[in-house]
Amino acid sequence: MDLISTQELKEKLDRGPDDFKLVMVMGEWEYQAKHIPGSLRINTLEEGLEALGPDEDIVIYDSGPACVASRRAYRVLKNHGYERVRCYAGGLEEWESAGHALEGTGIRRV
């Protein structure tokens, strides 16, 4: 699995999000509560396959190291011929712990 570190992702975002797609693979309410700036959210993997080009540079993330959603999405994309996919395994948990900016309402469903 091709991984990207917190520092590498921060550097990519600082250069500008136009050269890659940052994709959060979590539910709508989780996305609304908080996400990494510049992220888009995919409802289903089928929707992701339609929205993301196989030649695009893609970074997938979820809530953190204990969540398997990003790893599952990574495997599906790779199996469908997407070569430039990386997984940010640290997810929101590591991003927030590093003190980097988040977007969203901050309100989580209980």
Regions found by a protein language model. Give the residues of each.
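Rhodanese-like catalytic fold shared by cysteine-dependent sulfurtransferases
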Residues: 1-21, 28-60, 64-110
